[in-house]
């Protein structure tokens, strides 16, 4: 949830499009880090009171029986790699095994692309205008493009994005009146070659921008809701695939408990890459 982990010093301290958070091999690792890095910070305008950390003292081994989970693998009807979709759709069935009720459903987040691209361009213009102007030869083309996009925006673009984001937020709030958590893929493609800067297409559908392949992630970022990504399987080439779990605001401990239950039921974290064996 925005503010639980105080953001680092930023040119846009009221930014609500992203938040810092931990990474770890297991949910326990992430849980421990959350206990350490969360809390109040007088130097940032978006922060939670120190007392909120008491919620992180609950055990990870929570009661998951009867939780209502919505699976939205086709969210926004955006393109997604067939193998990634099949793996994540099969993986969500594991929640049934641990006592959850799973339904196929998703909220209306159709305008998330416009909102995300607008706010991202706005922030790039603030963060990188000096880099692009003073050191153009040291800045890659995607950063130049995103910065220029921000410089060319008008006030009406931000106004539209703000109105659309309000509707997205309300759609999510209403959605969580019916479900406890929302599950969807982490990205639209499996890991790709280090020699490829970004995917140009997904399932034969050409992408418009360098960031489009990450639509499952940034769609959730626009909502401002807490999320956690966990491994859920491997491709035919033994590449990892992830599923993300999303909850309503302030459901962080519940998300960690759900992720922990899934982790214990699947034990994907114990799988080592072929390069290690």
Language-model features: where?
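Structural helix-boundary/capping segments
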Residues: 1-70, 75, 89-98, 153, ...
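Short glycine/threonine-rich loop-to-helix capping motif typified by GTGT followed
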Residues: 82-84, 110-123, 193-199
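Short glycine-rich, flexible loops that bind phosphorylated cofactors or substrates
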Residues: 78, 190-191
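Acyltransferase
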Residues: 55, 80-106, 128-134, 158, ...
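Short connector loops at secondary-structure junctions
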Residues: 100-116, 147-150
